[in-house]
Regions:
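Bilobed "Venus flytrap"/periplasmic-binding protein-like clamshell domains
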Residues: 36-59, 112-162, 184
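Beta->alpha turn/N-cap motifs
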Residues: 38-42, 68-73, 82-94, 116, ...
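Acidic, polar ligand-binding/catalytic clefts
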Residues: 50, 54, 58, 63-127, ...
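Extended ligand-binding regions for polar small-molecule ligands
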Residues: 50-59, 124-132, 139-140, 209-250
């Protein structure tokens, strides 16, 4: 049955949005010809998601309306509130009782940025008594660190439009010895602080997927899954990653 739905969705994708216009299936995903897309306002997430959203909207013949959330916590809290028609963000932030997610679209490495003058030869060396690890409050990195860190202290700061600079300032002031975040923040933070460096390895991975609100039909789920997979297969995702100059993202 699942394969049949995907085949039907693939056939629909081959027809332009104008051609199948406001069918019940398209209307189920984009009511009234408008596609509201929930995203997180950070380059490695929203910056890559926007071209994917534009691709999906074009295929559906729908006008895209970005719904940008300022931080991961606000994005998480949006589920179940009918604020968007589809969402594109970390899989871990899409509650399974409130949304149905597609396959993964891209993956983001979680990295540590070490403050100048510190010695952390590898990931394992970070979790020691007396070490302070900075991170973004409520982000997937925060979830991983909260679960895995046993001895070090976690110092949380809010996500902001200047988060890489904020992370660098935290390290510069030695309020943190390392900063753990997605690579979209980690590498720019390291570049912003002379003497800072990326600790070899990754302490986790953030998987990004699209999601529909719970309760949409299997056919609508299959259509969205097919559209975002086409965006991945045709290079829309990779071009967005390359255009933003992101490292540790694939």
């Amino acid at each position: 049955m699942g394969r049949l739905l995907l085949s039907i969705a693939a056939l629909l994708v081959g027809v332009s949005g104008a051609a199948f216009g406001q069918t019940s299936l398209v209307s189920e995903i984009a009511p009234g010809g408008k596609l509201r897309v929930g995203m997180i306002a950070i380059t490695v997430l929203g910056g890559v998601a926007e071209p994917v959203a534009a691709f999906v909207g074009q295929k559906l013949g729908a006008a895209v309306e970005p719904v940008m959330y300022p931080n991961p916590e606000a994005y998480l809290q949006s589920f179940g509130k009918a604020e968007w028609d589809i969402a594109i963000g970390p899989r871990v932030l899409a509650p399974t009782d409130k949304a149905d997610s597609t396959a993964n679209l891209w993956a983001i490495s979680l990295v540590y940025v070490a403050a100048p003058g510190t010695e952390f030869p590898d990931i394992a060396s970070v979790d020691k008594a007396g070490v302070r690890i900075g991170t973004i409050r409520g982000a997937p990195s925060d979830r991983v660190l909260t679960r895995e860190i046993k001895a070090a202290e976690i110092v949380r700061i809010p996500l902001s439009p200047t988060i890489a600079a904020d992370a660098a300032d935290l390290l510069r002031s030695r309020k943190a010895d390392v900063f753990g975040a997605d690579s979209g923040v980690g590498y720019p933070a390291a570049d912003a602080l002379t003497g800072a460096r990326i600790v070899p390895g990754a302490f986790g991975t953030v998987l990004v997927a699209a999601a529909l609100p719970k309760g949409r039909s299997p056919a609508a789920q299959a259509l969205l899954a097919t559209l975002v997979e086409e965006a991945r297969q045709t290079g829309v995702v990779q071009k967005a990653i390359d255009a933003k100059g992101l490292k540790g993202v694939n």
